[in-house]
Amino acid sequence: MEIGEAVGRYEQAAALLPSRWQQAARRVPEHRKAQAEEFRLRAGRPMTLLTCEGELLVSDELPRQSVTQADLEQLCDAVTGYSRYAAAETMGKGYLIGRGGFRIGLCGTVAVRGDGGTALRDISSAVVRISRQIRGLWQEVPEWSAGGFDSTLIAAPPGGGKTTLLRDMIATLSNGTEDRCPLRVGVVDERGELAGMYRGVPQLDVGCHTDVLDGCPKALGIPMLLRSANPQVIAVDEITEAADILAMTAAANCGVKLLATIHAEDGEELRRKPLFRQLTEAGVFRRLITISTAEGRRHYRTEAL
């Protein structure tokens, strides 16, 4: 992503903030805006900016000013367009998706309803993720589609770039390249981080031939896509449960290719995970991409499974 585009995404995210914090965010140096990953607002404490250097105060001029609960309420109103009722379901799951595809994680007091659902009130903190589109990132991955695309698993630690790479691969498969035809891609976007759907429209580029199930658990969404969208590829973010593997195995048995991510610090940790052992035993994936970071740069390694 070009620096100007990265700064532009920062400014879009900053526009969601309460007015006094918007002003502080705009005074951040340009190079830091380009590196920013998250705004973090915690009631009773100053707002911080997460970068590769860690959490930093947004402004030295406001070191003792604290985020108030009114600030957090204003943020939620701005993101939902003053229609929290319409966003109650995702808010109860701990997040909101704003215009532009920005995901806002929320903490507060949780009330468990009789039907097992949850509601969130008395918001105590919010994390505004500055999602970025890095186009052409797939070209840095060695031989990920050599001989044609095959089912691929991406592994990296939290914040290691899995979702960004996954999104670019989805768009690339969906749009096609000079030497590859476009494929129909189905995405189960359980937490709204891949497509950033806002009122039914993807705010992030996931390709021209992509169908998205938003806010749906992977184990439910994968068979739904098989029935409704006739995909050639199904993509999901963050495999966490055995039920996810069962659904992906069923899709693979129907001839569908899979593209997914999983948390792991490195290949050694990945191979110790029971979920990974289940995946290899099921034979769902044919390629593994691991992402590591050294000296501020990400490195990609591809191997056969």
Regions found by a protein language model. Name each.
Residues 154:
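Hydrophobic anchor at the beta1->P-loop junction of P-loop NTPases
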Residues 174-223:
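P-loop NTPase switch/communication element
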Residues 165, 169:
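Hydrophobic positions on the alpha1 helix immediately C-terminal to the Walker A/P-loop
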Residues 1-100, 175:
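N-terminal accessory targeting/assembly segments
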Residues 229-288, 293:
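Conserved P-loop NTPase nucleotide-binding/switch module
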Residues 113, 118-121, 286-305:
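Conserved P-loop NTPase
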Residues 84-149:
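P-loop NTP-binding catalytic core
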Residues 162:
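Conserved lysine of the Walker
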